[in-house]
Every structure is written in C-alpha cells, then in structure tokens.
C-alpha cells in the first residue's frame, strides 16, 4: 500500500521472542485510528496472546492513539515512559491479564534495550507496576559498548 514503509520490526521481534522461548502468533498492520488499533489488539487477545507488542511511531507521534485504544478495551496504563536508555518511550499496560507493550524503535537497533529488561519478566507472568519502572533509573543507561556484553554488564542492574 502507498505510504507504508518496509517493516523492520517483525524479524527482530521474532528473533527476540525465540530467545525467550516464545512465539509471534500474529502480525497486523493496522491504521492509525483508535478503532483500527482496538481491533488489532482485540484480535491478538482473542487468539490467545499472553503479550501484545505494539510498534510503529509511538514515540514520535504526539497524536498516537494507542493509549486511547487500550483504555477503550478496558485496559490499565501502567507507564508511558521509563528512566531507561535505550527505551525511554516504552509503554506498558494490561488488558485483563494480557500485557500490552508499546515498543520504541530502539528495540530494532540496539542489542540491549528496555525490551530485554521487561519483556522476559512479563512472559514469566510477573505483573510489573509503576514502581518497578521507577527503580530502573539506577542502572538504566546502556553505555553502548563497542562489544556488547549484555546481560553481563551494569545495564538494567
């Protein structure tokens, strides 16, 4: 379709999911309207997703309606922003028992990011709260070493 960029997120998320012994069960390219996002998230939840990852310009679009879609689905927004770099514009919410994460583009480009600090915990069933993110400020800055040694480094400690 006109206006769509080639998706670079899917292969990265598939690889990261496999590393967590998880799988991607659905990839949906939705429109930007709240209803489109509601329908896409609902479809994933109805298919049995334990976690829904939302990507695509959330951190650069002040008119992003993803939080509105989550609220419309009865969800609870836990955080939209973290003291972690890379990953400051990460979003976490819950719709029932399903975690819905908004992933910033750094997840595609960095070896270690907020994804690696949070998503494995969510997949293990941990229900994170706002306070959990506040505590990530200590150790939440990746030094972008020439040779990444994550998780054997201070990032996320």
Feature names for model-found ranges:
Residues 8-14, 42-43, 68-72, 116-121:
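Short, solvent-exposed amphipathic alpha-helical segments in soluble enzyme
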Residues 4-8, 39, 64-65, 113-114:
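Generic recognition of short, well-ordered alpha-helical segments
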Residues 1-3, 57-61, 105-110:
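Gly/Ser/Thr-rich loops at beta-strand to alpha-helix junctions
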Residues 36-89:
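Glycine-rich phosphate-binding loop
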Residues 25-29, 53-56, 81-82, 131-136:
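A generic structural motif
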Residues 1-36:
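Glycine-rich phosphate/diphosphate-binding loop of Rossmann-like nucleotide-binding domains
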Residues 73-157:
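Flexible glycine/proline-rich
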Residues 20-25, 47-52, 99:
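Short, surface-exposed connector motifs at secondary-structure boundaries
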């Amino acid at each position: 379709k006109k206006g769509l960029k080639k998706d670079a997120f899917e292969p990265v998320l598939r690889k990261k999911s496999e590393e967590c012994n998880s799988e991607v069960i659905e990839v949906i390219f939705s429109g930007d309207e709240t209803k489109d996002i509601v329908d896409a998230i609902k479809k994933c939840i109805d298919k049995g997703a334990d976690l829904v990852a939302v990507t695509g310009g959330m951190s650069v679009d002040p008119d992003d309606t993803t939080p509105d879609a989550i609220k419309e689905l009865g969800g609870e927004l836990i955080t939209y922003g973290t003291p972690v770099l890379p990953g400051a514009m990460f979003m976490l919410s819950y719709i029932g028992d399903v975690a819905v994460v908004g992933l910033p583009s750094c997840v595609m480009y960095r070896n270690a990011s907020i994804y690696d600090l949070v998503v494995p915990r969510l997949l293990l069933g941990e229900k994170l709260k706002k306070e959990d993110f506040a505590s990530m400020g200590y150790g939440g800055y990746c030094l972008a070493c020439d040779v990444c040694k994550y998780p054997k480094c201070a990032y996320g400690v």
